[in-house]
Amino acid sequence: MPKLRSATTTHGRNMAGARALWRATGMTDEDFGKPIIAVVNSFTQFVPGHVHLKDLGQLVAREIEAAGGVAKEFNTIAVDDGIAMGHGGMLYSLPSRELIADSVEYMVNAHCADAMVCISNCDKITPGMLMAALRINIPVIFVSGGPMEAGKTKLSDQIIKLDLVDAMIQGADPKVSDAQSEQVERSACPTCGSCSGMFTANSMNCLTEALGLSQPGNGSMLATHADREQLFKLAGQRIVTLAKRYYQQDDESALPRNIATKAAFENAMALDIAMGGSTNTVLHLLAAAQEAGVDFTMADIDRMSRKVPQLCKVAPSTQKYHMEDVHRAGGVVAILGQLEKAGLVHGDTRTVLGGSLAELLNEYDVSRQPSQEVVDFYRAGPAGIRTTKAFSQDCRWPELDVDRAEGCIRSLEHAYSLEGGLAVLSGNLALDGAIVKTAGVDDEHLCFRGPARVFESQDTAVAGILDGTVKAGEVVVIRYEGPKGGPGMQEMLYPTTYLKSMGLGKQCALITDGRFSGGTSGLSIGHVSPEAASGGTIGLVADGDIININIPARSMVLEVADSVLAARRVAVEARGWKPLDRQRQVSFALRAYAMLATSADKGAVRDRSKLEE
């Protein structure tokens, strides 16, 4: 029978000092011997996805204590990628994932916590906490802050839905008036919550459901809706049950590594492909798998991308649907239900609810025979009222969207595409692979061949797009923006947004060893590995070189003779794999991150071989 980790600090005469300090936090004699549950919050006033989390940690804590546990809350940092984007702040976004993972490990292990509830929401916070949870391997439940309501405004006598990306595109389009741009800006982000489309934050919160580590509705129930409060309360109750199963019943199935197995990672990837999730999820799943000791690689993703269909299309791939519409159609469970019918997910994986995924689908899939309680849960909808408060409204859709032929979530027979929303490309330009979000690429652009226009940084690329240097038909190459070369692997949302603003969104392709926001659409290929700073071929591309992209064939080829590339490699190695004339201040903290960073095909995690020397 495993001993409570916290007993190290609460039992024995030699721990009198530790107990004295625990008493100073409010613990009593009756609390020593109960499981100590870390409530890992991420409240901050900097981030709309986290601005409403301040009191939610204590909401969970009260439920933990009522169920027989002891709750202790602490906070992690949280970076808003949208606010950090387009300037030096974006260098810190991906590295913050590692800091979050480490800070959770430090706090939980230093104080010998027995289990965790992770309250996350936005881009790097969920992945960072996920990495920590799988690293530490104690009982855990994830509960996110929930998605923002979609913005709405009236343009050209038509009410349209909006999000952050619309505000960026309108703001950069010289043909859009100041008044219209301001109108969109003021309407795009109306409430607290993670940005309203299938961007990175919402994608990751959906994937925790497929991994079995969060409850139904975690990824899709709006931040503002009263029904979301129940997810937080149940998380507090269920984590105590999980802790007791492990520590009192020696039930190792309650541990996250026995829930998030190889099969569960395949379920998560199948979901990601089917819903057209952010390419960043690939990076984070690879990183989490390494922490879990699961052999899940780019080869697995490539294999799955060829057989899993795209069943859902959500902003930024379409303006018609946002996360509130995904929830109305049954959320993650409904997508997984369609995949199960097609034999594309493993129904025998376990979840934090205690049963199998198949059992969960039978209870919560709105396409089956759900209870009225489940129906009402998925009818929860937006109120259209600007607010920063959680659980502040209880509006409901008049009916569910269960149209699997033309609705938000499709059946296999009516799939948007029989091949899914993400694809792995390879070739001499990306020997270890690259990722493209095919859900955001029009069919006529799946093949593209053109001359390279090379930039040594995102900043020079943005300038080149806006000043007309970039021409229709070119392949924009942005290099030295990978995990090591950036450092920090910046998101390239501004270059892709400005290509659209300049009328080049469907006239150019973009290739980078950096990454893309979940808000990116169009022929945007990221995560090129090896990155330029690690000697990747992308560091050898010259202006005018022909690049041939063929997504159906999963290939990306630089049409330059091997002898020419070999000569270029000698020249670059002589000067070092560094950008030419890049004006960028890189802090000591970022340099330290870069020293251990691996390329994207490894999840941009630390190079463990360097730590084991």
UniProtKB/Swiss-Prot annotation:
Enzyme class: lyase
SUPFAM superfamilies: IlvD/EDD N-terminal domain-like, LeuD/IlvD-like
Single GO term (MF): dihydroxy-acid dehydratase activity
Reaction(s) catalysed by this chain's protein: (2R)-2,3-dihydroxy-3-methylbutanoate = 3-methyl-2-oxobutanoate + H2O; (2R,3R)-2,3-dihydroxy-3-methylpentanoate = (S)-3-methyl-2-oxopentanoate + H2O
Pfam families in the record: ILV_EDD_C (PF24877), ILVD_EDD_N (PF00920)
Top-level taxonomic group: Bacteria
Modified residues (N6-carboxylysine): 124
Annotated keywords: 2Fe-2S, Amino-acid biosynthesis, Branched-chain amino acid biosynthesis, Iron, Iron-sulfur, Lyase, Magnesium, Metal-binding
Cofactor annotation remark: Binds 1 [2Fe-2S] cluster per subunit. This cluster acts as a Lewis acid cofactor.
GO biological process, one term: L-valine biosynthetic process
EC number: 4.2.1.9
Pathway noted in the entry: Amino-acid biosynthesis; L-isoleucine biosynthesis; L-isoleucine from 2-oxobutanoate: step 3/4; Amino-acid biosynthesis; L-valine biosynthesis; L-valine from pyruvate: step 3/4
PROSITE patterns in UniProt: ILVD_EDD_1 (PS00886), ILVD_EDD_2 (PS00887)
GO CC terms in record: cytosol
Residues holding Mg(2+): 81, 123-124, 491
List of catalytic residues: 517 (proton acceptor)
InterPro entries cross-referenced by the UniProt entry: Dihydro-acid_dehy_C, DihydroxyA_deHydtase, DiOHA_6PGluconate_deHydtase_CS, ILV_EDD_C, ILV_EDD_N, IlvD/EDD_N
Residues where [2Fe-2S] cluster binds: 122, 195
Cofactor(s) of this protein: [2Fe-2S] cluster; Mg(2+)
Record note on quaternary structure: Homodimer.
PANTHER family on file: D-XYLONATE DEHYDRATASE, D-XYLONATE DEHYDRATASE YAGF-RELATED
Function: Functions in the biosynthesis of branched-chain amino acids. Catalyzes the dehydration of (2R,3R)-2,3-dihydroxy-3-methylpentanoate (2,3-dihydroxy-3-methylvalerate) into 2-oxo-3-methylpentanoate (2-oxo-3-methylvalerate) and of (2R)-2,3-dihydroxy-3-methylbutanoate (2,3-dihydroxyisovalerate) into 2-oxo-3-methylbutanoate (2-oxoisovalerate), the penultimate precursor to L-isoleucine and L-valine, respectively.
UniProt similarity note: Belongs to the IlvD/Edd family.
Protein name from the UniProt record: Dihydroxy-acid dehydratase
